[in-house]
């Protein structure tokens, strides 16, 4: 291989009084060796250094939709800095009772007792996410660059406990209006997160729930699955509307509210306004609407349907979306399911105008 080092020889000094001047005695010094950069070194030097980012990815969706299986597959087949499980020990071991079992059994209680148990348990479930999130350091999200970036993946986002399941309980008549409001006010989104919202066929989702045979889920029915799927549809359509909101001091309270409740009726804004107590002032409704909007605008929701894909294809799809999406957050849940799916159309491009 040719040596990339060159020898530098200093020029001879010329005497002004004699054109045939002799060499300067200082010319006897040792040659100076210079390093000539190789082509690869020159190219690397011209490329600006890109600092490594650490992105936390959340997977979210209905129980049984395939979150945990996907979660485990991602962890086993992709470099993951940290994998954050659901805070299951909080729910099943550390509290005085198994609150997952209690909240499922509460459906058989009289209405007043049912409301008290469900609301209490849902708050315990939600606060457990705060304990888990306290150890996660997040940076401002950016498109994922697999050559330099690393990701962590988390099973569920706090959005599930503070928003999705409370909406589900409200739709099922197990939450009062003000109990739903309390959970929505308690939700606080500080960082910019992106959530993969896993969707799927309700019948296939229920089949997977029955297949894994968890004791606390024996009471799960197709109505339960449909209600929870509807809650996530409400969140998605609400998020679309929230991203369009811009505050204006020129608009009146009524004009502001009119903006939020316009469009598809299947938004949280419309539900909260339509079901509001007659004694609740409109300004209180508007304050909550603005709060919900500000929280949801910090999320990037990516609706996907992986039920019809084998896991290797689903992983490639997930990686592609990470690269092109500005920020990542996703949900995943522990479940043992195979790749059998319902024969339903896969529509990754969710159209919020179709929400009825």
Curated annotation (Swiss-Prot):
It catalyses: thymidine + ATP = dTMP + ADP + H(+). This is Thymidine kinase. SUPFAM superfamilies: P-loop containing nucleoside triphosphate hydrolases (SSF52540). The active site is at 86 (proton acceptor). Substrate binds at residues 122, 214. ATP binds at residues 61-68, 208. Transmembrane segments: none annotated. One of its GO terms (molecular function) is thymidine kinase activity. Catalyzes the transfer of the gamma-phospho group of ATP to thymidine to generate dTMP in the salvage pathway of pyrimidine synthesis. The dTMP serves as a substrate for DNA polymerase during viral DNA replication. Allows the virus to be reactivated and to grow in non-proliferative cells lacking a high concentration of phosphorylated nucleic acid precursors. Keywords: ATP-binding, DNA synthesis, Early protein, Kinase, Nucleotide-binding, Transferase. One of its GO terms (biological process) is TMP biosynthetic process. It comes from the Viruses. It comes from Elephantid herpesvirus 1 (isolate Asian elephant/Berlin/Kiba/1998) (EIHV-1). Belongs to the herpesviridae thymidine kinase family. Residues 1-29 are annotated as: Disordered. It is an enzyme of class 2 (transferase). Pfam families: Herpes_TK. Homodimer. Its EC number is 2.7.1.21.
